[in-house]
Amino acid sequence: MNMRTDPALLANPQLSFATVASGICIPYIERGTGEPVIFVHGSLCDYRYWDAQIAPLSAHFRCIAPSLSHYWPAAEACIQNEFGWQEHVAELAEFIVAMDLAPVHLVGHSRGGSIAFQLAREYPRLVKTLTLADPGGPLQLDGMREASLPSAMNALRAKVAGMIEEGVVEPGLELFVDSVSVPGAWKKSTDAFRTMAIDNASTLPKQFLDPLPAYSRDTASQIACRTLLIDGQKSPRMFRNNVESLEGWIYLAERATITGASHGMNVANPAAFNRMLRSFIDY
């Protein structure tokens, strides 16, 4: 099954691998007992992104954080499908079934929020509650012809992809991370975050060739479970617009804002994020 496995991957005693129905291998970490909570990472991240949630919340729930295919360490250790949001939705659904977890409390951040949203739409029986933190993707407002990201953002992404493909990795990552958070975010980030982002840099050009689907009134009306929408007070307007619209479109939605935080609100203020999430799940 393994293609090119770095022994360091196996150094984490909590790291496990699940083989799902399609034959691919999904790395994940798991801690705690109780109702299952699955954490879905976003761009440049993997299961490590949720460290500040897994440890404290595992005292109350069965916390599981997978790495989606092509993200570390799956890129080194696992058989994978093609890169794409649809593939990630399908493999995550297969993971929930293979692990006999349904229904789960599903938590997604940024691009992972889009994956979680689409999974809840397509596989409603697998999801008990849905939490979307700064969900990524374009917004299809009523009366608009076609939803897409702003042209300036697409131009920036093309530049970032070119830099990474040419080996100018850290400056490219800095440009992207600052664009989805606040200027200077990359330089202020922790060594652990920068290491994780560098480990996953090769996924970014692939991601830019695979646009996320738009949120719309129609698609949001198909979410049947209780939903918590979290944004950061200082998150870029695109994410806050998504949260604001989804709050009005999803029938059983509630919204919470983390004061002083930007896009990585669960890392910047984990105590507030964890408190909101636990209160919502325990309701």
Segment roles from a protein language model:
Residues 217-261:
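Conserved loop-alpha-helix segment in the C-terminal half of the alpha/beta-hydrolase fold
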Residues 165-205:
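Conserved alpha/beta-hydrolase catalytic His-Asp/Glu region
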Residues 86-104:
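Conserved acidic catalytic loop of the alpha/beta-hydrolase fold
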Residues 108, 112, 116:
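Gly/Ala-rich beta-loop-alpha elbow adjacent to hydrolase catalytic centers
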Residues 106-108, 133:
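Short beta-strand immediately N-terminal to the catalytic nucleophile in serine-hydrolase-like folds
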Residues 17-81, 95:
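Conserved HGGG/HGGXW glycine-rich cap/lid loop of the alpha/beta-hydrolase fold
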Residues 117, 121-164:
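Flexible "cap/lid" loop of the alpha/beta hydrolase fold
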Residues 261-274:
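Catalytic histidine-centered segment of alpha/beta-hydrolase-like enzymes
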